[in-house]
Amino acid sequence: MLDTAELTSNTHLAIDAEWVGTPVSLRDGHARVSLTTHARMAADARGLVHGGFVFGLADYAAMLAINDPNVVLGSSEARFLKPVVVGDVVVASATREAVAGKKHTVKVTCTRADEPVFEGTFTCFVLPQHVLGPDVARDVTGDAS
């Protein structure tokens, strides 16, 4: 739960928390996001969670650390340190380390019960307008009416 001293999210407003986590802390240049992994994330019958879900969690935390509606990911360097299994609660902690114009460097660590499972450096860019341009709009609500 966000406390009153924290910021409101300005980015990735339509994202589904089931797949990339729920923000638990959001401050200028910092974000923490929690993800409870579930069976539909499993890569095999033993419950190994596909690394893409952990990466998605880390990416979302990096975007929230920047917290601009026009932030995009340019590149990343990722290290998967330990396996994640169905039922694990993984928390991503993101901190903006540097800013050079529109380029932001964000360090992210994902932990399970305080044990690191992922580390990454994300190079993000804040663009002057949405990456799809000013005239592109899509109905992402799923409402066919």
Go through each PLM region and give its residues.
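Short coil/loop residues immediately preceding or within conserved phosphate-binding loops
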Residues: 18, 75, 103-105
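Hydrophobic beta-strand-centered segment that forms part of the acyl-chain substrate-binding groove
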Residues: 60-91
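A conserved, well-ordered hydrophobic junction motif at loop->secondary-structure transitions
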Residues: 38-56
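Non-catalytic linker/capping segments at the edges of enzyme domains
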Residues: 1-40, 135-145
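HotDog/MaoC-like acyl-thioester-processing domains
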Residues: 1-3, 70, 84-86, 97-145
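Hydrophobic residues positioned within well-ordered beta-strands of beta-sheet architectures
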Residues: 31-33, 76, 92, 106-108, ...
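Hydrophobic residues in beta-strands and at strand termini
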Residues: 35-37, 80, 126
